[in-house]
């Protein structure tokens, strides 16, 4: 990836942080800034700021500030429930469920709903393989669907693509070590990248 593209990707993330600061205050902005500073940006493992929908807004997806603002939301220990994760589940067919179930797809659905984009409404990660349109190459903020265990099974994981290198893909998502955070996964577990259909 060219140095110019790396800088454009970093600019998108900084703009997301500014939007979060404006809407949710300085503390939220500082959380994101700290996360950005901990993330290394090198040409071979940064995001591709391409524009799948051929308009200026596609390179800066509106759901990413929503997702990044949730950094650190985590599953509560047994005996208590995180009400925010219950909110995520309420965007799916798991209405009313607590935070003790898999909630990666619930988080993605919740973020998309906050950006006024209809998600799958399903708590199954692989439901995103039928949503939107496929991408040949991942772009910042696209939805990445991963296999889990047996590639032929219904199990999976879903999150928002940040970047990749030769071996790993870095996603921002929910239920990643039981919280909303960035996490690396084996690149060979990716089974699809998706983007909303325009209109």
Each PLM stretch: what is its role?
Residues 1-64:
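Cell-wall glycan-active module
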Residues 25, 63, 104-107, 137, ...:
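Generic hydrophobic secondary-structure packing signal
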Residues 59, 113, 117-181:
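...with weaker cross-activation on analogous glycine-rich loops/strands in unrelated enzymes
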Residues 181-187:
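Short amphipathic beta-strand/extended segments with alternating polar/hydrophobic composition
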Residues 188-199:
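Low-complexity, Gly/Ser/Thr/Pro-rich intrinsically disordered linker/tail segments
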